[in-house]
């Protein structure tokens, strides 16, 4: 079984995203790990789920790299959820200078990727690389 790497900093970043989306009229509801994505997004006015999302935070600016990477299993899960519910699923990234989103259904490139700083061989896997040019800026700071 893989270790859990979610930290308090990760939870703080998710709260920051929730606060930024609340300014736009949306609430985030944390989903159980078994669901495969982080949150359901609810329209506060209509009080219904309008999308699902996986949230990542990066410690650099949005345009530092030409793509944003995420594990392919998250993309597959997002596609399954969207196919079942008819609702979009988004990859939301909190950068140092912006909060951005892209629909998981957007085009991406498949390559090996991941990290090596934790010494966990399972951190390297098949990943989806979404072009930064395809992201929509939700908030700029």
Residues covered by each model-derived region:
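Intrinsically disordered, low-complexity terminal regions enriched in charged/polar residues
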Residues: 100-141
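Short acidic/glycine-enriched loop/turn segments that link adjacent beta-strands
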Residues: 33-37, 97-99
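Mg2+/Mn2+-dependent nuclease catalytic core
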Residues: 58-77, 81
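Short coil/turn segments at beta-strand junctions that form active-site/ligand-binding loops
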Residues: 26, 47-49, 87-88
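Nucleic-acid nuclease catalytic cores
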Residues: 79-107
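Conserved catalytic cores of phosphodiester-cleaving nucleases, focusing on short active-site segments
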Residues: 39-41, 45-61
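Acidic-basic catalytic patches of nuclease active cores, encompassing PD-(D/E)XK
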Residues: 1-33
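A short local loop/turn or secondary-structure capping micro-motif enriched for an aromatic residue
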Residues: 38, 60-63, 109-112
